[in-house]
Amino acid sequence: MKTIGLLGGMSWESTIPYYRLINEGIKQRLGGLHSAQVLLHSVDFHEIEECQRRGEWDKTGDILAEAALGLQRAGAEGIVLCTNTMHKGVHAIESRCSLPFLHIADATGRAITGAGMTRVALLGTRYTMEQDFYRGRVTEQFSINCLIPEADERAKINQIIFEELCLGQFTEASRAYYAQVIARLAEQGAQGVIFGCTEIGLLVPEERSVLPVFDTAAIHAEDAVAFMLS
């Protein structure tokens, strides 16, 4: 079994499911008392979020690259970045850390392609929904068209993520709002929906979505398990 290095804490609410899902995957594959060989570097999300708001993406990339190098020195054999949004800075990690990097958009793209879909809705932070680092990769590498909510919906989705979900607050009102947005995107022809923020799956259970759900945290964790046992 390879040792996986997790870059977490963005937010820590969604890092917990990564640890659980990876261990469950290892136990399911190997049985008995087997558990995952995991190293975790959890960053201070306050600093990361401030850099995001100021547009200081190079600084966030430096922080994560240094964390990845620390995991490499500690014995990690691959890197998993437990957040969608911070994949915007993946170039900094890949250019300075020689370990295999398991990109969350690649894992998600493979899952969508495997389900036979080419047109899906994308929910996430405003950075993930509006910028090209995530949508562009999914489109270019997997020929998947991502539909995003309207501007006012994107603003509210983003607000809920940072002001509620990242603080561990999960309300029925926000759950219903997300379900409403998903239903509207389904009417526009979306075949499925990407939960492109690792906290969204903590808020919206699959049964509340009219579309098949691609929960990026679960998909990414499954990809990590496959890598660890390869």
Name each model-derived stretch.
Residues 1-230:
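Non-catalytic structural scaffold of enzyme domains
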